Amino acid sequence: MQQERKVQHVFLVGAKSLGAYGGYETFVYKLTEYHQNNKNIKYHVACKANGDGCMDESKLDGVRKISDTEFEFHNARCFKIYVPQVGAAQAIYYDVAALNECCKYIEKNGIKNPIVYIMACRIGPFAKHFYKKIHKLGGRVYLNPDGHEWMRAKWSAPIRKYWKISEQMMIKWSDLDICDSVNIEKYIHECYDRKGIKGRNPKTTFIAYGADLTLSKLSDDDKRLLNWYKEKELSKKDYYLVVGRFVPENSFEIMIREFMASNSKRDFAIITNVNEKFLGELERKLHFKQDKRIKFVGTVYDQELLKKIRENAYAYFHGHTVGGTNPSLIEALGSTDLNLLVDVGFNQEVAKDTALYWNRSQGSLAQLINKVDNIENDKIIELGKKAKERVSKEYTWKKICDKYEKVFVK
């Protein structure tokens, strides 16, 4: 393959797909979207071909099919990796298989100076192998260390121990750690300074995630919106909202329990890709199906519709307790006026005084819901204005993607 030296090839490994609700999936979608006409960068994106959170490109507009396992979207080459159902090891298998595919492609096509950007610290035991292999091919390894994968509630104690060790190994065998939170960058230096290759400190930089501040193109009487409201039995400013991956550390159990305990007459709309096992577990604990206000409304891939649903929510819940700068939170600050966040350092770092906070103890969120259910509209408007000002100053996707361009092509 003939290639011009000025084009920087960047291989993105770690996101399951593009345009779903996970942080990395949102990031990859936006990064490729903002750089789709950038002649200096060519992205190659690994996607899951099967299983939980897998890529379904039929739900995206503007896809050009190359083969059964490859397609082009936002001018990025997206390649699908089949993952056998091997339990918790799936995530490790996926990243290893994707990296092997990257190395094969780089070698076969004679790509000069590639960057392989790995998202999350899942493959520590293989980090040295791939670091050396990619360096031998003339490339560099960049890492997004995510936010404390070893703390996530869904993992058992042995698996959490593995993630912690894996994190240390991956930070050691990387050329640059791109942290999406100041707290994460600080943590890396506190834990891993003098533990890099030959006792060096890890090289880090901070680039947050972004949000789109433009209003939805849909009007309040748009048929798509009205049909969705009718189907889900919701109405404007009469529902609390959450959008995010359906995993325990995102506080779904607490949010549902506390909403059920509140006196609100509004609904609680949950936009997520439901995991039946976790859903069944929540039903056994909470019996939420008896509360007609609790509504699992499925997924929304139409970005304009999703934006309008956010704008029209009475309030937004954010229960993420693990991770850095979460895209779903920034999108909420940019589109929903009233945001109710679990009180952890990452969320405080992003939202500061533009949101209201609750803790995970029983009664905290229910009390806050009862309070804000009757809050003065002027107060809501004031919080919304402050939130949008904060996002426009620090977290626009243009600003974030411009920073990534500088890191990738410098």
Residue ranges and their predicted role:
Residues A355-G363, K371-N377:
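Conserved acidic donor-binding segment of nucleotide-sugar-dependent glycosyltransferases
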Residues R5-V7, L12-Y21, Y34-A88, I184-C191, ...:
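N-terminal strand-loop element at the rim of the active site
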Residues K308-G324, D337-L338:
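Acidic donor-binding loop of glycosyltransferase active sites
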Residues Q90-C102, N113-D146, G324:
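An aromatic- and histidine-rich active-site surface loop
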Residues V10-V13, Y229-N250, I256-N263, A269:
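Conserved donor-binding/catalytic core segment of Leloir-type glycosyltransferases
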Residues I159-D177:
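Membrane-proximal helix-turn-helix segments that form the acceptor-binding/catalytic region
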Residues C47-D52, A211-D212, V243, D267-L282, ...:
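Glycosyltransferase donor-sugar binding loop
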Residues K172-K203, A211-S216, Y404:
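A short, active-site helix/loop in glycosyltransferases that binds the activated sugar's phosphate group
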